[in-house]
């Protein structure tokens, strides 16, 4: 999508959030997912530069952002986990839930190994069942699982896929779960930071955090292919998502050939009466 189209989309979103026409004098605030924070920051910068409103977005996590929106302390919330009917009912001023962008969730790791994970092995890693890299076909070394410590839509999407991958997964799904092992960190940036600075660490992060010492594992899909979390592989996964009447949808283990198996849509939830 080019900058002009992005600006048009975001002008529409912020117009809903403001409940009126928008201009450079308009100031809006949003809070939520860290997953799309990088692209949102860029889009909001481009929007302001083109004469649109100034938007302050705080990447506090999907759970905190949703609460802030329900409590009416921000103009819009953002999440990688769409709002359900029970949460929508709490928004007395109404809302319009809009899927804005999609992305993949990578198994990011810091170790000298060309890592390929079957779906069963991926679940075992996330469950804290694997303690040494040799169990994954790599040279021996301590493996440190790294996870989110805050309420996170990334965690919700990740655990949805883990549950779809294998019956070995017993932690359930949600924006937070009781991890039996590992190191917790706040936000995608926090998890990526732990992995970056801890040789032998592995965890789940937005694909945009795959850089430096943080490499992405190739993950097995339902076609038996081992796929990296590329834009193309993510698009193939998201093409299979069917949206409901609230524009919400998910596909925790896509069947398409070439699809990366952990991908999700990212939503904003402005209010038309704010």
Protein language model features and the residues they cover:
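Bacterial N-terminal signal peptides that target proteins for export
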Residues: 1-8
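Bacterial N-terminal signal peptides
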Residues: 11-17
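Sec/Tat signal peptide C-region and signal peptidase I cleavage site
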Residues: 20-24
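N-terminal segment of the mature folded domain
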Residues: 25-134, 138, 192-196, 202-212, ...
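Ligand-binding pocket segment of bilobal, Venus flytrap-like solute-binding proteins
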Residues: 66, 156-242
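Periplasmic-binding protein-like
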Residues: 99-107, 217-266
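Extracytoplasmic ligand-binding site segments that recognize negatively charged/polar headgroups
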Residues: 104-108, 114-193
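Conserved small/polar residues in nucleotide/adenosyl-binding loops
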Residues: 267-274
